[in-house]
Swiss-Prot record:
Keyword Translocase in record: yes
Organism: Verminephrobacter eiseniae (strain EF01-2)
Domain of life: Bacteria
The protein, known as: NADH-quinone oxidoreductase subunit I
The gene coding this protein: nuoI
Cofactor: how and how many bound: Binds 2 [4Fe-4S] clusters per subunit.
Catalyzed reaction equations: a quinone + NADH + 5 H(+)(in) = a quinol + NAD(+) + 4 H(+)(out)
Complex and partners: NDH-1 is composed of 14 different subunits. Subunits NuoA, H, J, K, L, M, N constitute the membrane sector of the complex.
Source taxonomy: Bacteria, Pseudomonadati, Pseudomonadota, Betaproteobacteria, Burkholderiales
Gene3D superfamilies: 3.30.70.3270
Subcellular location: Cell inner membrane
Function: NDH-1 shuttles electrons from NADH, via FMN and iron-sulfur (Fe-S) centers, to quinones in the respiratory chain. The immediate electron acceptor for the enzyme in this species is believed to be ubiquinone. Couples the redox reaction to proton translocation (for every two electrons transferred, four hydrogen ions are translocated across the cytoplasmic membrane), and thus conserves the redox energy in a proton gradient.
Sorted UniProt keywords: 4Fe-4S, Cell inner membrane, Cell membrane, Iron, Iron-sulfur, Membrane, Metal-binding, NAD, Quinone, Repeat, Translocase, Ubiquinone
Length: 169
């Protein structure tokens, strides 16, 4: 068995531990940050700017003539990793398909944006609305009519966000 030699005595280490150098370094760091300009945002009164790619509440869009854009291709339903979208469709008299049911369960949705990216006609979009709530679970279950109402109400903001994001697409 070999004996372990004790570490040699060092005045430098003794001075560091005795004089509490690390403590004063920490206090200096705290002191430097204590007098800097505050960056806290007082949320309800002040709002930070949102990115054009911010993903908030979903909306269904319409064409300028008032017809809904969704062609019931069901790509958004297929690509949704959280299985939050439910679509049912039927054929019209002219042979085109349209949705009879388009539901999004926001309690399941992870706001990944895959539904928006997969839509070939830009029907489903995610708005910049993030201030919404529900008092019970069913309040966060959006039907086709509710999604169309959101799209109609915020069409100007949606179009502006799409235009700002166009250079990145």
């Amino acid at each position: 068995m070999t004996a372990v030699a004790a570490a040699p005595f060092s005045f430098k280490d003794f001075f560091k531990s005795f004089m509490l150098v690390e403590l004063f370094k920490g206090m200096a760091l705290t002191g430097r940050h204590a007098f800097r300009r505050k960056v806290t945002v007082q949320f309800p009164e002040e709002k930070t700017p949102l990115s054009p790619r911010f993903r908030g509440l979903h909306a269904l869009r319409r064409y300028d003539n008032g017809e809904e854009r969704c062609i019931a291709c069901k790509l958004c339903e297929a690509v949704c990793p959280a299985l939050a979208i439910t679509i049912e469709s039927e054929l019209r008299a002219d042979g085109s398909r349209r949705t009879t049911r388009y539901d999004i369960d926001l309690t399941k949705c992870i706001f990944c944006g895959f539904c928006e990216e997969s839509c070939p006609v830009d029907s489903i979009v995610e708005t910049h609305i993030f201030e919404y709530h529900g008092e019970k679970r069913g309040d966060l279950y959006f039907t086709k009519d509710m999604l169309l109402a959101v799209g109609d109400r915020y069409e100007a903001e949606i179009a502006a966000a799409r235009a700002a994001d166009a250079k990145y697409r």
